[in-house]
Swiss-Prot record:
Protein's UniProt name: Mitochondrial tRNA methylthiotransferase CDK5RAP1
Keywords: 4Fe-4S, Iron, Iron-sulfur, Metal-binding, Mitochondrion, S-adenosyl-L-methionine, Transferase, Transit peptide, tRNA processing
Subunit text: Interacts with CDK5R1 (p35 form). CDK5RAP1, CDK5RAP2 and CDK5RAP3 show competitive binding to CDK5R1. Forms a complex with CDK5R1 and CDK5.
Entry's Gene Ontology BP terms: brain development; mitochondrial tRNA modification; negative regulation of cell cycle; negative regulation of cyclin-dependent protein serine/threonine kinase activity; positive regulation of mitochondrial translation; positive regulation of translational fidelity; regulation of neuron differentiation; RNA modification
EC number: 2.8.4.3
Length: 601
């Protein structure tokens, strides 16, 4: 019998789920089993007959079709802190951290920040401790990004640095274990294990529940990996552990994966297909965050609730959210796309959509700001725009990734829209949400991009005048459609030159857009001290722009006559006096609440 067949048979018969990759420990056990099979096992005929009888008896005692139908409906999961049963080849105590210290480093997007909190929640329940001191760590985990080559090169360089740390490890301490988590583990699993023997574990974005097992296997001196992508993993029952005791905001993952299959993008291959969390679990997490108490850096003069004041809903394609967990909402209701937009896949039907979720989340706490990222322009039906306009605590800021201003390049990118459709959507959004702040993504030097295509992108930047932007040179990724069907034919120096031009134009136009705020009074959520001045405070306005203002005493509108100093988590009114492409400056007027601020802004 092949060793892998042995593992799979044990797996099925004992009822525990599929392993993404079989550890060397379990393979060794199976090899030992198969090498002794000729003397310890019955003849093949008797074995086959016994297996058939055993299968028949288990089938008769197994669940009925009615049981299957009942279990197929998604349960209302509660956030659980229980440790799952160990696989048969490990004892329960081998899965426990025994107070070993874990050091976590996060690279890349906001989803990775949230993934770090999920991974830490799982490890904490298994008995690990967290440290911010690299030197005292027993386990170092890097949560990685694979969106561009530069992001991966950063990790390779970091591993080279950690190799020296592992080599110098005193023998009196437990061996240092190093793990790669996230998208890079998913994309380059074999290369990482073969190239960097000092890497002990790999865990893809859908395998964080398996971290205790992987670390237990690594304790035997073997490399261990789980990079299986899931069709249903959302970590809905895992309450992420917020990593900062003084944080004013938090990320809440509402869905994972992406179905868009844009030709340049590696995300569908590193994070899998779209699947959404049940709304009930999202609301439970948001409620906990609104009640979560954090300690401000200085005692407030007026004590009150210090729950988190801002939540950002996260997803690779956040506004395509679709909760199909409740059967009564699974009727074939058509999906409304933005006008002039199409999809590259068969449009799904039914379920509770993003507008319903946004409505419910905004009702949890009227004093909590709600943001979301990263959306796709195709999924902005009127009901979403109307809700953003009506609710005071849903930020009037929309990220609208364009990627290019050329319809020809957009078609090659498989974005599902033309330049004209995109511009029409921009106008519609601004009409629906007066004063909305817009941000976008752009790629310079995509496959086949000509100078004329580049000029069209420049003109789009000038036409729209974004408040914020994220601009990058194109980086070819293996497995993508562009890698298989297009040619990366724009020279690197041309990509960089075009990128610099886009950045220059963006800054010019963003400065113009932001200067319209000068003289206006804006509501700012205080985050803390400015990084550049100990006498200034820093916060963000409704449009997610950074606002700097002096740390001075002010009035509290809810406590007339009381003078206070702002602290993280406070809402303050700031009169804007100057603006650049990235920052607003002003002077503080008073401390207020989100609901009361509408009378002043």
């Amino acid at each position: 019998m092949h060793p892998l067949q042995c593992v799979l048979q044990v797996q099925r018969s004992l009822g525990w789920g599929p392993l993404a990759s079989v550890s060397w420990l379990s393979l060794r056990m199976c090899r030992a089993h198969s090498s002794l099979s000729s003397t310890m096992c019955p003849s093949p005929e008797r074995q086959e007959d016994g297996a058939r009888k055993d299968f028949s008896s288990r089938l008769a005692a197994g669940p009925t079709f009615q049981h299957f139908l009942k279990s197929a409906s998604a349960p209302q999961e509660k956030l659980s802190s229980e440790v799952e049963d160990p696989p048969p080849y490990l004892m329960m105590d081998e899965l426990l951290g025994r107070q070993r210290k874990v050091y976590l480093e996060t690279y890349g997007c906001q989803m990775n920040v949230n993934d770090t909190e999920i991974a830490w929640s799982i490890l904490q329940k298994s008995g690990y401790l967290r440290t911010s001191n690299l030197q005292e760590a027993d386990v170092i985990l890097l949560v990685t990004c694979s969106i561009r080559e530069k992001a991966e090169q950063t990790i390779w360089n970091r591993l080279h640095q950690l190799k020296a740390l592992k080599t110098r490890r005193p023998r009196s301490r437990v061996p240092l274990r190093i793990g790669i988590l996230g998208c890079m583990a998913e994309r380059l699993k074999e290369e990482i294990l073969n190239r960097e023997k000092m890497v002990d574990i790999l865990a893809g974005p859908d395998a964080y529940r398996d971290l205790p097992r992987l670390l237990a296997v690594a304790e035997s001196g073997q490399q261990a990996a789980n990079v299986l992508l899931s069709l249903d993993e959302t970590y809905a029952d895992v309450m992420p552990v917020q990593t900062s005791a003084s944080a004013t905001s938090a990320f809440v993952s509402i869905m994972r994966g992406c179905d868009n299959m844009c030709s340049y993008c590696i995300v569908p291959f590193t994070r899998g297909r779209e699947r959404s969390r049940p709304i009930a679990s999202i609301l439970e997490e948001v409620k906990k965050l609104s009640e979560q108490v954090f300690l401000p850096p200085r005692p407030p003069k007026v004590l009150g609730l210090q729950g988190l004041k801002e939540v950002t809903l996260l997803g690779q394609n956040v506004n395509s959210f679709r909760d199909n967990s409740e059967v009564q909402f699974n009727s074939a209701v058509p999906t409304n796309l933005s006008r002039g937009f199409t999809t590259n896949y068969k449009t799904k039907q039914g379920g509770l959509r993003f507008a319903h979720l946004l409505d419910q989340v905004s009702r949890v706490d009227p004093e909590m700001r709600i943001r979301f990222t990263s959306p796709h322009p195709k999924d902005f039906p009127d009901e979403v725009l109307q809700l953003i306009h009506e609710r005071d605590n849903i930020c009037k800021q929309i990220h609208l990734p364009a990627q290019s201003g050329s319809s020809r390049v957009l078609e090659a990118m498989r974005r599902g829209y033309s330049r004209e459709a995109y511009v029409e959507l921009v106008h519609h959004i601004r009409e629906s949400i007066p004063g909305v702040s817009l941000s976008s993504d752009f790629i310079a030097g995509f496959c086949g991009e000509t100078e004329e295509d580049h000029v069209q992108t420049v003109s789009l930047l000038r036409e729209v005048q974004y408040n914020m932007g994220f601009l990058f040179a194109y980086s070819m990724r293996q497995k993508t459609r562009a890698y298989h069907r297009l040619k990366d034919d724009v020279p690197e120096e041309v990509k960089l030159r075009r990128l610099e031009e886009l950045i220059t134009i963006f800054r010019e136009e963003a400065t113009k857009a932001n200067q319209t705020s000068v003289g206006c009074t804006q509501l700012v959520l205080v985050e803390g001290l400015s990084k550049r001045s100990a006498t200034d405070l820093c916060g963000r306005n409704d449009g997610n722009l950074k606002v700097i203002f002096p740390d001075a005493e002010m009035e509290d509108v809810n406590n007339p006559g009381l003078r206070v100093r702002a602290q993280p988590g406070d809402y303050v009114l700031v009169k804007i006096t100057s603006a650049s492409s990235q920052t607003l400056r002003g002077h503080v007027l008073c401390r207020t609440t989100l609901r009361d601020s509408s009378a002043y802004c």
